[in-house]
Swiss-Prot record:
Signal peptide: none annotated. InterPro entries: Ribosomal_uS14, Ribosomal_uS14_bact, Ribosomal_uS14_CS, Ribosomal_uS14_sf. It comes from Clostridioides difficile (strain 630). One of its GO terms (biological process) is translation. HAMAP family: Ribosomal_uS14_2_B. This is Small ribosomal subunit protein uS14. It comes from the Bacteria. Binds 1 zinc ion per subunit. NCBIfam families: PRK08061.1 (NF005974). The gene is rpsZ. Belongs to the universal ribosomal protein uS14 family. Zinc-binding uS14 subfamily. One of its GO terms (molecular function) is rRNA binding. Part of the 30S ribosomal subunit. Contacts proteins S3 and S10. Pfam families: Ribosomal_S14.
Amino acid sequence: MARKAMVVKQQRKQKYATREYTRCTICGRPHSVLKKFGICRICFRELAYKGQIPGVRKASW
């Protein structure tokens, strides 16, 4: 879990655009965040298996 201080720090508007980075809105994880959904791969997988993300299906070919 992300520390509360880091989550609050990330939410503030940065002085320079290059300092901004994505963070998972559910768990606060800073790495492997899917920009389209705003959540990390781990949370995405859990929600997709539960069917809580509309339009996402398990791939089969």
